């Protein structure tokens, strides 16, 4: 389904872009509104999310990266990286009240596989397969061939993954927190925690370490890379991310309406407004064209 087919009206001129997106077409694919500096907004529910890569291999046949995601609807959830933040590797599963398997990915997506006998049925629009390959152990197979293994019912988290060529990556936990990632060619990521919060990340392929600091409400407030460059994070009274300041002092501001939906994203060079009007979402870009 092409997102362009959902755009009913678009006006471009004098630095103003207005798009009207109908929400009734959101059953499987929900158009995302692009914001500044890698921010995105779900046009259906107004949730803010973005990804942040802190480490990654270069020119490797087996890529590995340390990547975090923020989701404003999870502002009360702490996975060990500050409220609202999750780690890309942190896939989780649980069994629901009727025996189905619910799998949540690191970016916050949640899919429920309904149980029918010994089989599990994927939700509409999802082409992955879930199976209980041993008692209490589950395997998720993607259409592309990647497989994810959930062998520890205590924590309900992914314990290993294989790519379509059979190369295996192993995840090690301590007290439910991911402390080590190791792939088949020897790349490793090591994570250190204090009081249940990530404080330092190191990797075999990355020079130096990255440090993380939090406020008294367990919200990520500062990230500092190996060169001493820091990114700062601020929040509103509802624990939603409302300001990001990069190492050069440039700010990205995020505002929310009374329903907790993103209503504005602003930087020194861009200004984007979003209104939610019944069955449609109105997106206005005030940024002057270059």
Question: Would you name each region that the model predicts?
Answer:
Residues 1-83, 89-91, 95-102, 108-110:
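Intrinsically disordered, low-complexity segments enriched in small residues
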Residues 30-31, 66, 85-87, 94-95, ...:
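Extended charged/polar low-complexity repeat regions
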């Amino acid at each position: 389904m092409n997102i362009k087919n959902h755009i009913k009206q678009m006006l471009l001129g004098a630095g103003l872009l207005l798009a009207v997106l109908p929400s009734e077409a959101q059953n499987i694919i929900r158009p995302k509104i692009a914001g500044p500096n890698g921010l995105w907004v779900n046009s259906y529910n107004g949730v803010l999310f973005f990804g942040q890569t802190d480490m990654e291999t270069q020119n490797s046949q087996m890529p590995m990266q340390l990547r975090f995601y923020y989701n404003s609807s999870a502002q009360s959830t702490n996975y060990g990286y500050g409220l609202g933040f999750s780690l890309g590797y942190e896939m989780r599963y649980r069994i629901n009240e009727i025996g189905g398997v619910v799998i949540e990915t690191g970016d916050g997506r949640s899919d429920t596989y309904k149980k029918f006998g010994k089989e599990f049925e994927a939700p509409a629009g999802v082409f992955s397969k879930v199976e209980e390959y041993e008692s209490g152990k589950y395997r998720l197979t993607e259409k592309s061939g990647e497989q994810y293994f959930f062998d520890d019912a205590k924590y309900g988290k992914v314990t290993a993954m294989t790519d379509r060529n059979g190369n295996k990556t192993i995840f090690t936990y301590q007290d439910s927190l991911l402390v080590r990632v190791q792939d088949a060619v020897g790349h490793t990521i090591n994570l250190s925690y204090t009081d249940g919060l990530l404080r330092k990340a190191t990797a075999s392929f990355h020079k130096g370490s990255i440090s993380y600091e939090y406020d008294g409400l367990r919200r990520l407030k500062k990230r500092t890379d190996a060169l001493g460059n820091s990114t700062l994070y601020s929040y509103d009274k509802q624990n939603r991310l409302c300001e990001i300041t990069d190492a050069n002092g440039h700010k990205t501001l995020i505002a929310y309406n009374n329903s907790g939906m993103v209503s504005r994203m602003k930087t020194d060079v861009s200004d984007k407004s979003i209104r939610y009007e019944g069955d449609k979402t109105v997106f206005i870009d005030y940024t002057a064209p270059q």
